[in-house]
From Swiss-Prot:
It comes from the Bacteria. Keywords: Repressor, Ribonucleoprotein, Ribosomal protein, RNA-binding, rRNA-binding, Translation regulation, tRNA-binding. PROSITE patterns: RIBOSOMAL_L1. GO terms for cellular component: cytosolic large ribosomal subunit. Belongs to the universal ribosomal protein uL1 family. Binds directly to 23S rRNA. The L1 stalk is quite mobile in the ribosome, and is involved in E site tRNA release. This is Large ribosomal subunit protein uL1.
Amino acid sequence: MAKLTKRMRNIREKVDVVKQYEINEAVALLKELATAKFVESVDVAVNLGIDARKSDQNVRGATVLPHGTGRSVRVAVFAQGANAEAAKEAGAELVGMDDLAAKVKAGEMDFDVVIASPDAMRVVGQLGQILGPRGLMPNPKVGTVTPNVAEAVKNAKAGQVRYRNDKNGIIHTTIGKVDFNEAQLKENLEALLVALKKAKPSSAKGVYIKKVSLSTTMGAGVAIDQASLSATV
């Protein structure tokens, strides 16, 4: 049997796996246990009351967190003409059409988000096998295929998170860093949950948000008492 590290022993001693923690208590505990030599991300897992096997119950979308994610995001935009100029002015690092597609095909992908104007999809469509497996393929459902590329760039830079349930009906995303304060992480989590509730499939029955858990990059997960969140959630 593998020997537990000091960090893992500390986590086991301090985290009650059956308890639902009040949000501020949970954040304080995660901060205490985040001992990695880098600033860890705070991640959330939301178990949804959906049947992920049914396409009409899948949940997918995007929302801008009020305090961002703490990450620096590099944006690539497929657009031409006025849209290309607007994307550059909004702060996109890479803007182009066939020239940008050539870079992607050559493996030059120094970006985190890809946005496209609708008229650019004839070019982007050729890149599906490259961008798709990396989760980078633009999609109108998450606002990355849009005629308003400037707004999409600003949203990406402002801390927009994209979400999609996995095969078990669980949403995984990031809501910030451990150096955010308790209020910032709480408000980011609440903003995400509000967005998820708005995206609830009409065919989903019973309890929709079944469980909410927070964890850090290298830490254990703690379950959140949803009653400790804002009444608007």
